[in-house]
Amino acid sequence: MSTPISDLIAFLTADTSDFNALGLWKYLILLLFYGLMAGSLWFAVANWREDPSQRTGANLWLWATRVAIGCMWFQGTLWKLPFGHENGLYYWTQQMAGRAAFAVHRDFVANVILPNFDLVNPFVYLAELGFATALVLGLLVRLAGTAAALFTLNLWLGIYDKRPGDPDEWPWSYVFLIFLCGTYAVLATGRALGADAWLRRNVAAVRDGRGPGALVRFVS
């Protein structure tokens, strides 16, 4: 019987079915996860030490929830691997071709996405890995949160309908994630013990909004 504790241990030791499907590559993916977590902790500690305004319970809460949702996105990347027609992404893309709320969406998936799935798969993986990285580190969160909300909107609409025999999905779970990621963007939660706060304080071009730093400041 699985429990939250046993499932957490299995994930942290790369001993889940999704991890094991990757063979020895799973250890590289696990190392990446630990690297992101170490980076998140480094930015949190640095911000806490350097900026008294960061030392609030609200910032701790925003940091913890942002990192948790980033971990969710990271875990979700695993079933996009290995690339090919045997992974979970291909199955759910097929589902979208028959379950999307609107005909134009169904037709686009059936006639464009599925025939070019081998090209689409890496882009979807990198997009979700980007969301995970941004949220765990608190990096460019206004941009990443907006993109993640729109990405999830596509998922919500894509499997909105349910045909006989289709697996059940709870649509509200996607709605909650849309609003949560959108909230991270609106509140710019990368400024709560994240890389965005560190960049806006320590990188002159970002702090002063000069040159390319102005764009970084806008999306952070």
Predicted features along the sequence, with ranges:
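Extended, low-polarity transmembrane helix blocks
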Residues: 1-100, 107-126, 137-220
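Core segments of transmembrane alpha-helices
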Residues: 127-132
